């Protein structure tokens, strides 16, 4: 299944999207980001985490910092080159490129079936701390140990931690405006794919699948 060009023209900041030669080019206003695509079973996934700072209607996503932090407002966190989105941003339904969706529970469960629950075949070779669970990246999914944002116990804010140890992905529910019961968690010390607890303070990565 392939697309030469899809042209979406909202009133402001037109969005251009192309899917050709296993590359997704996501153009949102002046922001242009390309994502390699990998096919696993019958699914087409982005091979890198979403890293846009604009919604797919061209509007800016708020960067969450200690000076403007609010757990109820939509936004993203940034650490190094990594982008993490909070729950409020994810459930806007406006993060994924047109024609794609944030991976939902059905997509993740099908992926688990394809790989027989072996998280090692999803892990890229970069950043993971050494353990007996050795990444193989046999699928080309290229999951990276980006770390996650979680709640600070002492106050109402978020903190970045577990770099090199964990990566967690948002998992959508029945629609793109609701999350499933748990996210998807990969750890450095096990091949098992675990559930990631949610809260309004979490900042997790996003992977997309074609609709």
Task: Label each region the model flagged.
Residues 1-4:
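Short, small-residue-biased leader/transition segments that mark boundaries at the very start
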């Amino acid at each position: 299944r392939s697309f030469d060009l899809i042209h979406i023209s909202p009133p402001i900041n037109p969005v251009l999207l192309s899917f050709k030669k296993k590359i997704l080019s996501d153009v949102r206003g002046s922001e242009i980001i390309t994502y390699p695509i990998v096919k696993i079973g019958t699914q087409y996934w982005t091979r890198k985490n979403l890293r846009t700072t604009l919604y797919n209607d061209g509007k800016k996503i708020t960067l969450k910092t200690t000076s403007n932090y609010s757990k109820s407002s939509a936004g993203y966190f940034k650490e190094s080159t990594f982008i993490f989105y909070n729950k409020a941003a994810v459930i806007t339904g406006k993060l994924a490129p047109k024609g794609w969706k944030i991976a939902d529970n059905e997509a993740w469960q099908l992926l688990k079936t394809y790989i027989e629950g072996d998280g090692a075949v999803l892990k890229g070779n970069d950043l993971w701390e050494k353990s007996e669970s050795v990444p193989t990246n046999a699928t080309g999914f290229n999951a990276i140990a980006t770390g996650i944002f979680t709640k600070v116990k002492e106050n109402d804010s978020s903190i970045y931690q577990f770099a090199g140890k964990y990566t967690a992905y948002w998992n959508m529910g029945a629609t793109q405006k609701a999350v499933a019961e748990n996210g998807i968690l990969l750890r450095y010390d096990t091949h098992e794919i675990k559930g990631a607890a949610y809260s309004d303070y979490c900042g997790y990565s996003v992977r997309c699948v074609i609709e």
